[in-house]
């Protein structure tokens, strides 16, 4: 692809890459999705995020090793196709595209929940439609616009979470004897595991959704100005972000009020907002709701970006219609952005017909697609390592503890499938082999047509 009408531009600077990696990891899975897990697991949710976060970090290092060696467009599908075969590449690319369609739809649905906190009279589909149009227009501009918008949205998230931790810590350290705020709330009121370890174990699949956007950095490689430097830096900082954004923030807010006294009500309310509201600090609750809304928009913005770049990559590889390989003068794959947007528009319809159930359905569908995606990345990395060994090459950014880390990841994925199967989400598990079979049939038909 040598002409200007078919190439992306390296318009993302190091600071963009760092914040995109951060932004993809902090969204609805933490700010809204943690409500249901707190009710089921209590304070042990902190350990749960640490466990899933560690697995996500291992995946990031495996992916990072491949990306630094070859910073190409459509990284996941490219590596699966090169080191595993054409069908794994075809499946990986389209599956990742579906993952981010679902993630974008989930975050967009969550935005309506946050708007509802202030204006309950506004229908969910109206809020969804407004932000859908706004973010779509943003992604049709130069990639630098996306980089800058995501940079500042992520800055807001980072500053907010750190400020909340500091403010929460201040409330804990200055609490009087009659205050309910205390670190002891983490082990009192039923203990750290109030419903036993099973209460946490069966929530791990739900927690996995929170880390669904963490591998987004792989999509930035083709548009990063210095991928060999920026990609490793961003990936290595992920573990510290997990400790701060997930572990530290939840430890602080769950110390402020006993977990069993939180008025959460399922997936409709953010525990971050409700805790400060129950403490009588209304202005903080409103400020946090605004911050959390920007967090959801940030991940949705990233989802739109990832969708279009993966679709572009599939087209370049010959696994999608060539029209999606065309880019504008600004280096934006316009056709890919528009087509992805049309699918995401389904979120507006979901919120019109089933506003109450939309978020829960989308989250578990996203986890099912994410399970397959992580498995493909880890399997592909094993084949990549075998190829590197045969060619006597030394990796510039080797994965941690490979191949042991690969087997840890794959075992964890098997465990997630078991949890989903036994906790009433059999359909999410059953749809995985059906999806693979459908994609294989489509791949076979397309391959046959190409051979004619």
Task: Show the residue positions of the predicted features.
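Helix-loop-helix connectors at the membrane interface of multi-pass transporters/channels
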Residues: 1-5, 78-81, 107-128, 160-163, ...
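C-terminal membrane-solvent junction of multi-pass transporters and transport-like membrane proteins
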Residues: 152, 323-334, 371-425
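Membrane-helix boundary/coupling elements in multi-pass transport proteins
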Residues: 72, 95-110, 211-224, 282-322, ...
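TM-loop-TM module centered on a large, flexible mid-protein loop between adjacent transmembrane helices
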Residues: 78-80, 85, 117, 234-301, ...
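Membrane-interface loop-to-helix entry segments
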Residues: 112, 126-181, 212, 235-239, ...
């Amino acid at each position: 692809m040598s002409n200007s009408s078919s190439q992306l531009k390296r318009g993302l600077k190091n600071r963009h890459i760092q914040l995109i990696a951060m932004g993809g990891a902090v969204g609805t899975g933490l700010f809204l999705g943690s409500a249901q897990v707190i009710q089921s697991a209590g304070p042990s949710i902190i350990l749960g995020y640490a466990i899933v976060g560690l697995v996500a970090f291992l995946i990031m290092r495996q992916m990072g090793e491949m990306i630094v060696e070859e910073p190409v467009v459509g990284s996941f599908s490219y590596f699966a196709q090169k080191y595993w075969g054409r069908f794994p590449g075809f499946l990986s690319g389209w599956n990742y595209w579906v993952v981010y369609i679902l993630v974008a739809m989930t975050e967009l649905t969550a935005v309506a929940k946050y708007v509802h906190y202030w204006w309950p009279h506004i229908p969910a589909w109206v809020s969804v439609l407004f932000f859908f149009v706004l973010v779509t227009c943003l992604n049709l501009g130069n990639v630098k616009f996306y980089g800058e918008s995501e940079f500042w949205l992520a800055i807001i998230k980072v500053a907010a979470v750190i400020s909340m931790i500091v403010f929460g810590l201040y409330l804990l350290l200055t609490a009087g004897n009659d205050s309910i705020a205390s670190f002891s709330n983490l082990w009192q009121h039923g203990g750290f595991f109030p419903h036993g370890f099973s209460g946490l174990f069966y929530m791990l699949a739900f927690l996995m959704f929170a880390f669904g956007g963490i591998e987004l950095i792989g999509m930035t490689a083709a548009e990063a100005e210095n991928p060999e430097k920026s990609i490793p830096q961003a990936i290595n900082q992920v573990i510290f972000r997990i400790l701060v954004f997930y572990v530290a923030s939840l430890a602080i807010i769950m110390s402020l009020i006993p977990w069993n006294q939180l008025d959460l009500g399922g997936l409709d309310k953010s525990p971050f907002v409700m805790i400060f509201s129950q403490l009588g600090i209304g202005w903080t609750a409103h400020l946090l709701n605004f911050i959390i809304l920007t967090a959801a928009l940030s991940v949705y913005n990233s989802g739109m970006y990832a969708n279009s770049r993966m679709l572009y990559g599939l087209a370049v590889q010959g696994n999608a219609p060539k029209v999606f390989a065309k880019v504008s003068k600004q280096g934006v794959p316009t056709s890919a952005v528009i087509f992805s947007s049309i699918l995401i528009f389904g979120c507006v319809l979901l919120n019109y017909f089933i506003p109450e159930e939309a978020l829960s359905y989308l989250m578990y569908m996203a986890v099912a697609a994410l399970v397959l995606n992580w498995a493909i990345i880890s399997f592909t990395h094993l084949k990549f390592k075998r190829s590197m060994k045969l060619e006597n090459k030394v990796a510039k950014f080797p994965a941690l503890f490979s191949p042991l880390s690969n087997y840890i990841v794959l075992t964890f994925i098997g465990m997630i499938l078991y949890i989903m199967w036994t906790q009433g989400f059999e359909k999410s598990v059953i749809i995985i082999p059906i999806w693979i079979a459908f994609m294989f049939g489509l791949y076979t038909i397309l391959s046959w047509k190409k051979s004619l």
